[in-house]
């Protein structure tokens, strides 16, 4: 345990304050714009102390990547020091992707913003370093998408959604474009930069659950599994 959250500091979005035995510091992650000079201070959370691991068992290369010579453990979490002295985890270094233009985007941040689109229930943003913008794979909100198609079905190539095969609906280019446009409208309203706007979207006809392997037991995205499953569709549509 490196941080604890006493009751008087408890609030959504914070992981608390360091325990007495632990030193903590934020280190600049220059490329993504996380600096200790930001207001509030931001950067990679680094920990040191007797309760912090010294390294990986019989894996010196991993240890060298994660632990500095003077004992700081580089967590890979991007943290923020709040005015009340608590810390919040706002990102993960591994979820920051450098695009072709050299700028980084934060996948989880984009997902949290775009989830408010009324036509989806889940989303995984994916970015290729050779692309100028990200793309997304989404699970549709079926009742809302069906309602849209009852209104605009003829225009979108689904004149009778009740008789249409749902897999075909999800693969329909015009339906995908309609969902993409709404996602980007949500993103624009939230202030996303042009390079953070989605280039394309794929619609999964299947719900993502821990049982089918697309989510962890904690409802986190299994990014590698989802990407592997949609590998051919991604190659065909992106970048």
Where are the model-predicted features located?
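Active-site loops of AMP-binding adenylate-forming
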Residues: 1-12, 28-32, 59-62, 142
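Conserved A3 ("GATE") glycine/threonine-rich loop of ANL adenylate-forming enzymes
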Residues: 1-6, 17-23, 105, 131-132
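Short Gly/Pro-enriched turn/cap motifs at secondary-structure boundaries
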Residues: 12-18, 70
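Residue-level signal for inorganic ion chemistry
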Residues: 24, 85, 114, 136
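Conserved ATP-binding/catalytic segment of the ANL
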Residues: 33-40, 44-99
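Conserved C-terminal "lid"/linker of ANL adenylate-forming enzymes
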Residues: 97, 122-124, 180, 184-239
């Amino acid at each position: 345990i490196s941080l604890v959250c006493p009751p008087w500091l408890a609030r959504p979005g914070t992981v608390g304050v360091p325990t007495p035995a632990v030193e903590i510091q934020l280190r600049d992650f220059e490329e993504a714009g996380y600096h200790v000079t930001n207001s509030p201070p931001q950067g990679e959370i680094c920990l040191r102390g007797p309760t912090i691991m010294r390294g990986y068992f019989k894996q010196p290369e991993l240890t060298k990547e994660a632990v500095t010579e003077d004992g700081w453990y580089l967590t890979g979490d991007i943290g923020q020091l709040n005015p009340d002295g608590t810390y919040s985890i706002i990102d993960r270094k591994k979820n920051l992707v450098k695009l072709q233009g050299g700028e980084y985007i934060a996948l989880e941040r984009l997902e949290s913003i775009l989830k408010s689109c009324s036509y989806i229930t889940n989303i995984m943003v994916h970015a290729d370093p050779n692309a100028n913008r990200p793309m997304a794979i989404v699970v549709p909100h079926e009742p809302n998408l069906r309602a849209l198609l009852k209104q605009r079905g003829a225009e979108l190539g689904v004149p009778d959604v009740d008789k249409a095969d749902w897999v075909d609906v999800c693969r329909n280019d015009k339906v995908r474009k309609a969902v993409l446009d709404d996602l980007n409208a949500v993103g624009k309203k939230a202030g996303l930069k042009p390079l953070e706007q989605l280039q394309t979207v794929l619609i999964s006809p299947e719900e993502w659950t821990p049982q089918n392997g697309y989510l962890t037991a904690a409802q986190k995205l299994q990014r590698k599994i989802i990407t592997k499953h949609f590998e051919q569709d991604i190659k065909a549509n992106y970048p």
